[in-house]
């Protein structure tokens, strides 16, 4: 299977990339940083999700896309950073979907992840996909992002 991963330099993306690269998969990484440290055989395509759709070659022949790109959340949340977090989820996803929509052979699967913050801090409560969103900044970002038409 050929899998494209955005956000492969992030906390989840790094681990996912390494796990998939260790299997029998072809991995294409879309990253803002050309110097990203990649496992052998992983193809790198430079893409800034805020500036426009990814390069056509980065998605050519891809069976699945895992979209994890976005402004890092592990930093101090100033008003400016909060706006970057909001914008990076919506704009990056829109640019990716725009590119996918023009392809003659589209990937079978698009998985997007924004933040576990959707559920908020609920202690020992067991959460499922049917659980309501939590409260707070990240929950609000996730809810707004998931409601954006793509």
Regions found by a protein language model. Name each.
Residues 2, 26, 108-109:
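Residues at the starts of beta-strands that form the adenosine-phosphate
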Residues 135-150:
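Active-site Tyr-X1-5-Lys
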Residues 3-23:
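N-terminal Rossmann NAD(P)H-binding glycine-rich loop of SDR-like oxidoreductase domains
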Residues 35-92:
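NAD(P)H-binding glycine-rich loop region in Rossmannoid oxidoreductase-like domains
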Residues 6, 30, 65-69, 110-116:
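SDR active-site strand-loop-helix element
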Residues 15, 19, 99, 148:
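Rossmann-fold NAD(P)-dependent oxidoreductase module
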Residues 84, 94-136:
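Conserved Rossmann-fold NAD(P)-dependent oxidoreductase catalytic core, especially the SDR/UDP-sugar
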Residues 25-32:
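Conserved glycine-rich Rossmann-like NAD(P)H-binding loop of the short-chain dehydrogenase/reductase
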